[in-house]
């Protein structure tokens, strides 16, 4: 997928570089970046992803999504400046994987008593009917059988 297609899903402040390059994957962990990666620099509680941009470029990243303008380099890499890297990552990942949430049906269970029982019964019913199902509750979390 081309950078320009992928970033069409996010709010961009500024672009420096060629957006016509092919992206092989999206990474937010600098240790997993390889040739063709788009690296998303996120500010965390223990580390700042912006500190790893140079390392990612050296490993072959073709694009970097970042919040801090001072980290934009001179390399032949596309830098995409955004206000919120976390939000940009979520939107790009959603698009990258074919917008899966648009294909999902969601059932919410609210009330005072019986929510877990009702949700579990619905999970088992839909599973028996052959649907791919998930269950998120305060007791268990399942995606299909796992």
Residue ranges and their predicted role:
Residues 7, 87-146:
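Phosphate-binding loop of NTP-binding sites
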